[in-house]
Amino acid sequence: MKLLLAIAGLFLVQTLAEDVRAHEESSFLAAVAPEEQRACIKEGEKCAGDCQCCGKWSYCSCPLFGALGCSCIIGDAMVCVRKKKECRTSDVMNTPPGGCFSSSKRRHGR
């Protein structure tokens, strides 16, 4: 019976320690400077979501369900459309200027 109480006590202490650790982690993340939260990630670097990747056509790719890690890669115009709906930061969507389907090449004569 004492062994059961000791195990229950250790479980309670472990649970409380995890709660405190999670609270400290969330308060640390809230204290991160706003510039660091808004900074975008260049292609080839590790990411956690599409809105972190710089450029309107770049997105966060996680091959093999993230087993190899996730990184920003170049996408297409549909990535731009999706990011316009999901992402709130302007520095992610500002390069290159123009719409999602814009092209610098103009067709002449047709």
UniProtKB/Swiss-Prot annotation:
GO annotation, cellular component aspect: extracellular region
Keyword Signal: yes
Highest taxon, organism lineage: Eukaryota
Classification via InterPro entries: Toxin_34
Localization, UniProt: Secreted
Principal cellular location given in the protein's record: secreted
Summary of the tissues where the protein is detected: Expressed by the venom gland.
Chain residues in the propeptide: 18-38
Keyword Secreted belongs to the record: yes
GO molecular function term, any single one: toxin activity
Family named by the database record: Belongs to the neurotoxin 37 family.
Protein name: U9-agatoxin-Ao1a
Organism per entry: Agelena orientalis (Funnel-web spider)
Biological classification of the source: Eukaryota, Metazoa, Ecdysozoa, Arthropoda, Chelicerata
